[in-house]
Amino acid sequence: MENLTPNGELLDLEDKNIGPEQLSLLCHAEDLSSVKQLFLSQNEICAESIEILSRVKGFTGLVSLYLNNNLIGDEEAKVLANAEIFKNLKCLMLEANNIGTKGAEALASSPNLKNLEVLFLDSNPIGPQGARALACSEKLPSLQALHLDSTEVGDEGTQAIAESPYFNNLKKLYLCSNKMGNVGAIALAKSESLKNLNVLSIWRNEIRDAGGQAIADSQTFMNLERLYMSLNFIERPVRKVIRGSDLAKRLTTLVMD
């Protein structure tokens, strides 16, 4: 098959103008069980194509699915959430689509994502309720990395994540460009469930001195290795406190203007 690597593990259909007809061919492919990674990014994939993709049975060994930069909305997300193709996934890339609260709720309640370790929902308007749905889900027990940059979650969504009883295994959390202020930052700093984080990215938000101080004093981030918090509203004296804190001494990377 064209665009399949010699070992049969990667099928790259990114930006190949893949429409319903081409996806239908996948439905009839004899054996796709060796494919571990499927790239379908940048193909303007929408409703009809998602319906077809959800019926593909051959990708029994698929662990990574890339659907970023398409036209996937809430209804398409609902279809995907119940798709056979999801059952063994460890990585799902849905960045830069049009998935809102309902779509996030569908993914959060999917019976097929129990093995998922990495979820990319950056640049989708899931909002605070979408974040809450993910945070309250028992269906994502393996999740280790959650990418929610530019998802409009704000303080409310950040609080829901910080208070989640199900994110104890989370190691990487990305919340850039979400208009998060002190409330969200303080919630993260006081979280009882985010103690295994080793990467936290909260740059380009609206965190001020109180939020910055809470992060510096936090006992939550004992395992944190990398912290990205540039482009907030933290004044120089508090930035100095952060740089001199025990937290900063433990970090391998601190990015802060």
Positions of predicted regions on the chain:
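Leucine-rich repeat
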Residues: 1, 19-28, 47-55, 74-82, ...
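LRR N-terminal entry segment and analogous cap-like coil->beta motifs
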Residues: 1-51, 63, 68-71
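Inter-repeat linker/turn residues at the boundaries of leucine-rich repeats
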Residues: 6, 30-33, 57-60, 84-87, ...
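Conserved hydrophobic beta-strand positions in leucine-rich repeat
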Residues: 11-13, 38-40, 63-67, 89-94, ...
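A generic tandem-repeat structural signature
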Residues: 45, 51-126
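Eukaryotic tandem repeat interaction scaffolds
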Residues: 117-206, 211
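Leucine-rich solenoid repeat scaffolds
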Residues: 216-257
